[in-house]
Amino acid sequence: ERWDRCVAATAHPQPYGFSWYLNWVAPTWDALVYGDYEVVFPLFPREKNGISFTTRPYGTQAVGPYSTIPLSAQWVEALMEEAMKHFAYGEFFLSPSVALPSHWTSEKYSNFILSTKASYEELAAGYSAQTKRNLKKAQKSSLESAQWATAHDVVRLWKQNTQDKTAITAENIDSLAKVLEFCLYQKRGVLLAVYDEGNTLVAGQIWVQFHGRSTLLLNASSSYGKECGAPTLLIDQMIQLHAGSDHILDFEGSSIPGLARFYSGFGAHDEPFYFHVENNLPWYLRWRKPKTTRS
């Protein structure tokens, strides 16, 4: 409870740092804890060929550090130094609100979010011309809500249409599927999906909903679903569900230009997070991995 209170201290926190989420995606996770859980920093110890390292587990994006007190850049640097006492190599994906030391050269990654405080009419008016066209096309396509679709159905749709275009392994996606099923079972998630006229699932999305934030963890669509604008229709439904409330829709990315255009087409803006590397490997191994991102 103390851990989760610290993670929840940020308004509309991302789900990745909560203990129940970490327990699913990284059962052997560890952490740095300061004081009475005033600052917490999840770590993910791994070992390969006798070399200890840490990197984020699949199913997470930015993972801390989290705090209930102001966290300066000096604090963040001290946490990093403490963490690296345990690893020869570290990849850290730092949360959007984290202050970075000025001499760090951490890489910026995109993450698109949308506040739904405004009315639906105001939010829809902010859609791009392309998004409005896609939505109109979907509304004319005789798509039907797939009320009985399951997480398994949406994962299968993703595997059939997207997996071979990515570097994501079957083990990765099966692990994520367990997290999604848990979230839906615990009422911490929502599944939206549509069938075509032939009762075939053509698009599905699973969002994790927790502490005033809905995060799109899986977005699956067939080629026909994309062609008729089904993903746009589902996101529009999600916006309608939360319009007029103090809520954040988190699209999770992306740095891929096409996806960035798609999500920003709903009026979403970029809330970047940061990739920081600490490379203390022996000299004969150091060149194989990214350099330390600080000058």
What are the language-model segments listed below?
Residues P15, G90-E91, A146, D250, ...:
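A local structural micro-motif
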